[in-house]
């Protein structure tokens, strides 16, 4: 017998220890029968919230199912503990900025913070029952990972996929680093559309509307549409920039929108991506007036060396400007503004402050002819939230644009769950217009294994580290054959995605067959079987991982990708610390327990955003309670650890429940093979509540007790109850691992319910279509009897003098076994089958008319 009440806290503590000690989730290390999961390493950027638990549970459902199916599961946990997200956490923790404390001290601070955060993450992931093999834990800042990440870079560089170039890039002036296209979010911001009066050399006034008037000092051309009749006479002429008097060409280009603003556009270097396009297409000069701090810097245009745009390291030393390979050679133009009022008033101001000042100056001079408040989309950094600038700097890139078609082919080779997410990836790839910028001007990340030569005759030559010397830090180490005076180290670090994009290879301990660590398992687990992730990182993690696997090995990184939706807060927005709408998991786990939280996460369909719901948690709690109580009831009729058998099942309604169970096993298995955990749980839960608890337990219990029935009928009920409960526990085990383990241990075996090969096999059952149909008719009649009793305000146990049933056809009449159970469950003294009965309730399918005589 089970205890009266189920204590989830006691049980969770017990099995967290037992599972780890018994190594039930340990990967055996053999290629045969291995199922490899590429898991998302949580970013060390703060505390985990319930939204993180949401997606990690989805992966665990599949891991537990595949393990019980008989697979040897390779299920690692990683921690993404390098890069900008971690740096921001450290800066917030210590209330300082990286540059204020210096590189070495800041890196020490990073290690201190991530160690504490990792322990908190581990405790939380364990507390919700994620079945990782903790011996496979990895970290994106570990020696092994840095080695593999640097191997990846060297392989890509040698193959011509990685290159360094000076070009306009997206710049975050708060975090003071380049970022990639995938790290942008478009925000709708309030602004103003300002109309500025320019003139031509012939003194004709022309109006240009812009949201960035502070950039007019960097104007290098004026554009109109070639079919705009208003300005056809201006094409080929020269415009004069107001205040500073600089002359710029007026050029026709089809990318001008005739109906936007005044139809004239000033090209400034750089306000947006269109400015980049025009500057490069028409070979226009560059006038850079915004610096890396996001301030107006008019002095920079007098610096012919352009040092701040040639890869300054964070210490202020030029670290990578010597490189000439692949660099563009823009011609710069000087703006004659020194010793003028406009220079004095705006130089050194932040961009938004300068914008206000410029509008004021233009208004005072009568050069602002209009200003309209608008809302428009602004490109912002995903992490810092700040508006991005476009600055020309030296950066490292990985090619994407010239490989779109090939990567799209790889995307189509992969199985996407749900399939609609593949289209999202395809749209992203087709819309790419930048190569992937992988260098970051930060401290805490994987260093580029690169130096630049100062030797005479090879100035600027890229020197790669030898593979056998990896990992290297160019700031501390030297390349073979060079002295300190002969090289300049690359001071940048890699974008954290550049490392996270090789998580399948990190698990394999090899980038490909050429670049590997000792004792690698590349041939055993690469490519992986499954990648599980949420949909917002399709354009980053999924895309970059597919790209790198293609470049490194012409392979997919995994065969299947399962994409979860977001967990939304009550306001239907994604949970995030910045929005202040996060829900911490600890309080929910303390209130409901891990199984109930897991139940809530399983009630979300793949790829669909789900609002956090206390109501679903309450339903989950009722399920856990009902499972315990139903098991407690069944345990009355069985000996502990008795053999589970159905070889003596003889009664129709027992065969009915087993036939229903056959279908549920089939449906749940097929759903989980397609990674549809929500549908699988729904099928099992529906069977448990409706078929097993509401119906079968009631009709079988008197036979199970042995009241006025044959020993044969009694044994049939006991075997069926014992077998069905055992199977229900195993079907629910991936979702509710704790309570199913506790009941299974108490009643069925001292082995774990989660053991490999313990998934129910429908072939153990014989599907009996006749018994299922007979049982369904039984249930139609029983439901009408229950309704009649309810309509007469009597309990379901109220004695019936006579139960009268009319069947439309003789073949629908219940057999004697089913009639015996019907008479018992309805508490009827007798059942009369009548061909003449007209009054009574009719079943939905019209097969039966039912009436009763009550005492």
Curated annotation (Swiss-Prot):
Entry-linked Gene3D superfamilies: HUPs, Isoleucyl-tRNA Synthetase, Domain 1
Chemical reaction(s) catalysed: tRNA(Val) + L-valine + ATP = L-valyl-tRNA(Val) + AMP + diphosphate
GO MF entries: aminoacyl-tRNA deacylase activity; ATP binding; valine-tRNA ligase activity
One GO CC term, this protein: cytosol
Chain positions of motif 'HIGH' region: 42-52
EC number per UniProt: 6.1.1.9
Superkingdom field: Bacteria
Its biological purpose: Catalyzes the attachment of valine to tRNA(Val). As ValRS can inadvertently accommodate and process structurally similar amino acids such as threonine, to avoid such errors, it has a 'posttransfer' editing activity that hydrolyzes mischarged Thr-tRNA(Val) in a tRNA-dependent manner.
Membership in a protein family: Belongs to the class-I aminoacyl-tRNA synthetase family. ValS type 2 subfamily.
Domain notes from UniProt: ValRS has two distinct active sites: one for aminoacylation and one for editing. The misactivated threonine is translocated from the active site to the editing site.
Protein name: Valine--tRNA ligase
Organism encoding this protein: Wolbachia sp. subsp. Brugia malayi (strain TRS)
Gene of this entry: valS
């Amino acid at each position: 017998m089970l205890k009266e009440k189920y204590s989830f806290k006691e049980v969770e503590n017990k099995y967290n220890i037992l599972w780890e000690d018994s190594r039930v989730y340990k990967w055996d290390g053999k290629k045969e029968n291995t199922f490899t999961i590429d898991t998302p390493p949580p970013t060390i950027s703060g505390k985990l919230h319930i939204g993180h638990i949401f997606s990690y549970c989805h992966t665990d459902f599949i891991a537990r199912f595949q393990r019980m199916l008989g697979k040897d599961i390779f299920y690692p946990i990683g921690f993404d503990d390098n890069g900008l997200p971690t740096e921001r956490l450290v800066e917030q923790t210590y209330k300082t900025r990286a540059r204020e404390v210096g590189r070495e001290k800041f890196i020490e601070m990073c290690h201190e913070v991530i160690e504490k955060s990792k322990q908190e993450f581990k405790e939380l992931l364990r507390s919700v029952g994620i079945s990782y093999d903790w011996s496979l834990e990895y970290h994106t800042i570990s020696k092994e990972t840095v080695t593999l990440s640097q191997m990846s870079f060297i392989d890509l560089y040698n193959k011509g996929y990685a290159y360094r170039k000076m070009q306009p890039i997206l710049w975050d002036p708060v975090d003071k680093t380049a970022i990639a296209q995938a790290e942008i979010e478009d925000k709708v911001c309030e602004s103003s559309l300002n109309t500025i009066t320019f003139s031509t050399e012939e003194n004709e006034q022309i109006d240009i509307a812009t949201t960035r008037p502070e950039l007019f000092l960097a104007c290098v051309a004026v554009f109109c549409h070639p079919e705009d009749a208003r300005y056809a006479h201006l094409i080929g002429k020269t415009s004069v920039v107001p205040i500073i008097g600089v002359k710029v060409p007026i050029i026709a280009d089809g990318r001008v929108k005739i109906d936007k603003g005044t139809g004239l556009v000033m090209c400034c270097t750089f306000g947006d991506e269109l400015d980049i396009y025009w500057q490069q297409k028409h070979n226009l000069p560059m006038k850079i007036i915004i610096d890396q701090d996001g301030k107006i810097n008019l002095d920079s245009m007098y610096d012919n060396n352009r040092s701040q745009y040639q890869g300054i390291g964070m210490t202020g030393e030029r670290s990578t400007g010597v490189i000439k390979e692949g660099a563009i050679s823009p011609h710069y133009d000087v703006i004659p503004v020194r010793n003028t009022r406009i220079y004095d008033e705006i130089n050194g101001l932040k961009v938004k402050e300068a914008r206000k000042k410029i509008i004021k100056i233009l208004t005072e001079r009568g050069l602002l002819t209009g200003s309209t408040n608008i809302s428009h989309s602004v490109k912002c950094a995903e992490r810092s939230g700040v508006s991005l600038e476009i600055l020309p700097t030296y950066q490292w890139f990985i090619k994407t644009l010239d490989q779109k078609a090939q990567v799209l082919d790889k995307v189509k080779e992969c199985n996407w769950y749900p399939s609609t997410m593949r289209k999202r990836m395809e749209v992203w790839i087709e819309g790419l217009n930048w190569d992937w910028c992988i260098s970051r001007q930060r401290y805490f990340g994987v260093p580029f294994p690169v130096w630049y030569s100062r030797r005479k005759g090879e100035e600027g030559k890229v020197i790669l580290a030898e593979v056998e010397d990896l990992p290297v830090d160019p700031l501390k180490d030297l390349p073979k054959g060079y002295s300190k005076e002969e090289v300049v180290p690359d001071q940048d670090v890699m974008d954290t995605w550049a490392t996270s994009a090789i998580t399948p290879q990190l698990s394999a301990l090899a980038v490909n067959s050429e670049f590997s660590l000792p004792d690698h398992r590349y041939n055993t687990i690469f490519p992986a079987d499954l990648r599980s992730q949420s949909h917002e990182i399709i354009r980053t993690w999924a895309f970059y991982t597919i790209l790198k696997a293609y470049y490194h090995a012409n392979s997919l990184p995994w065969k299947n990708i399962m994409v979860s939706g977001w967990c939304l807060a009550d306001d239907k927005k994604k949970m995030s610390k910045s929005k202040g709408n996060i829900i911490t998991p600890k309080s929910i786990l303390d209130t409901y327990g891990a199984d109930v939280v897991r139940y809530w996460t399983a009630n979300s369909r793949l790829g669909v955003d789900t609002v956090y719901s206390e109501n679903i948690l309450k339903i989950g709690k009722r399920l856990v309670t009902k499972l315990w109580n139903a098991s407690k009831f069944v345990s009355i009729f069985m000996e502990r650890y008795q053999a589970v058998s159905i070889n003596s099942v003889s009664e129709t309604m027992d065969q009915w429940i087993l036939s229903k169970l056959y279908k549920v096993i089939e449906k749940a298995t097929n759903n989980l093979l397609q990674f549809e955990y929500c549908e699988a749980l729904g099928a099992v839960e529906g069977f448990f509540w409706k078929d097993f608890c509401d119906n079968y337990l009631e009709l079988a219990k008197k036979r199970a007790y042995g009241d006025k029935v044959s020993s044969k009928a009694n044994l049939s009920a006991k075997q069926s109850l014992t077998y069905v409960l055992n199977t229900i526990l195993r079907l629910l085990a991936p979702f509710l691992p704790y309570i199913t383990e506790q009941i299974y241990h108490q009643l069925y075996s001292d082995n774990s319910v989660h053991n490999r090969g313990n998934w129910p096999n429908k072939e153990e059952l014989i599907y009996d279509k006749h018994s299922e149909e007979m049982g369904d008719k039984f249930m139609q009649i029983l439901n009408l009897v229950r309704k009649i009793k309810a309509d007469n305000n009597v309990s379901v146990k109220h004695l019936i003098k006579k139960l009268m049933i009319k069947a439309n056809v003789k073949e629908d009449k219940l057999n004697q076994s089913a009639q015996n159970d019907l008479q018992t469950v309805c508490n009827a003294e007798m059942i009369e089958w009548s061909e003449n009965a007209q009054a009574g309730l009719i079943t939905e399918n019209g097969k039966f008319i039912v009436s009763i005589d009550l005492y």
